C-alpha cells in the first residue's frame, strides 16, 4: 500500500479501533473524555480508545459498552492489539484529553470527570505495567488527536492552544 493509499481510521465516542502503518488513527470531541493510544513501535500498530467515564460501575444499563469506561477499555484495547500481533511487553501509552470543560462552584470531585478519567486510565495502565510516554491532559479545551503508528507521534489540535505533537 502506498502512502497515498493510507487511510485515517476514525474512532467514535466510547469506541475503540486498531490501525497499522501506513494508516493513521483519529478521534475528536475529547473534552472530559480521554483518548488513550496504546502502541507497539516495532509492529507499527496502535489502538485508540475514546474513554468517556472512569468506572463501569457508573453504567445504568445491563449491556456494557466496554470502550466507554476506563476500567474496562484499557484491557479491551490491549486484547485487540495482542490479536493484531502486538507484544504486551512492547506496549506503550500516550494520552490526551481529560479537560474540565465546565467550572462548578462545588468542589465535589464527582463532578471532575476529566481528571478522574485520567487517573483511572493511569491506574489501569499501571496494573498492566504499560508506561505513559507522554500526555496532554487537563486544562479547559477540547481536543482532536491523530496518531501515526510509524513515527509514534500523537498530533493534538485544540481551538484555544492550536496544535502540538507529543
From Swiss-Prot:
Catalysed reactions listed for this entry: L-glutaminyl-[protein] + H2O = L-glutamyl-[protein] + NH4(+)
Record CDD domains: CheD (cd16352)
Short name of any one Pfam family annotated for the protein: CheD
Position of the signal peptide: none
EC number: 3.5.1.44
Record keyword rRNA-binding present: no
Bilayer-crossing regions: none
Keywords tagged on the record: Chemotaxis, Hydrolase
Top-level lineage group: Bacteria
Example GO biological process: chemotaxis
Keyword Cytoplasm: no
GO molecular function, one term: protein-glutamine glutaminase activity
Role: Deamidates glutamine residues to glutamate on methyl-accepting chemotaxis receptors (MCPs). CheD-mediated MCP deamidation is required for productive communication of the conformational signals of the chemoreceptors to the CheA kinase.
HAMAP family found in the cross-reference section: CheD (MF_01440)
Quaternary structure and interacting proteins, as annotated: Forms a complex with CheC.
Similarity comment: Belongs to the CheD family.
Protein's name according to its UniProt entry: Chemoreceptor glutamine deamidase CheD
Gene name linked to the record: cheD
Amino acid at each position: 500500500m502506498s502512502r497515498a493509499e493510507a487511510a485515517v481510521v476514525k474512532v467514535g465516542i466510547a469506541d475503540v479501533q486498531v490501525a497499522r502503518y501506513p494508516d493513521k488513527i483519529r478521534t475528536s470531541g475529547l473534552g472530559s473524555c480521554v483518548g488513550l493510544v496504546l502502541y507497539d513501535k516495532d509492529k507499527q500498530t496502535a489502538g485508540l480508545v475514546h474513554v468517556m467515564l472512569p468506572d463501569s460501575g457508573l453504567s445504568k444499563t445491563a449491556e456494557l459498552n466496554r470502550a466507554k469506561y476506563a476500567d474496562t477499555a484499557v484491557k479491551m484495547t490491549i486484547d485487540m492489539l495482542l490479536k493484531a500481533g502486538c507484544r504486551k511487553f512492547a506496549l506503550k501509552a500516550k494520552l490526551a484529553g481529560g479537560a474540565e470543560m465546565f467550572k462548578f462552584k462545588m468542589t465535589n470531585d464527582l463532578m471532575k470527570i476529566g481528571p478522574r478519567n485520567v487517573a483511572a486510565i493511569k491506574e489501569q495502565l499501571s496494573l498492566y505495567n504499560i508506561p505513559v510516554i507522554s500526555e496532554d491532559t487537563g486544562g479547559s479545551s477540547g481536543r482532536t488527536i491523530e496518531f501515526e503508528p510509524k513515527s509514534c507521534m500523537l498530533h493534538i489540535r485544540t481551538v484555544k492552544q492550536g496544535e502540538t505533537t507529543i
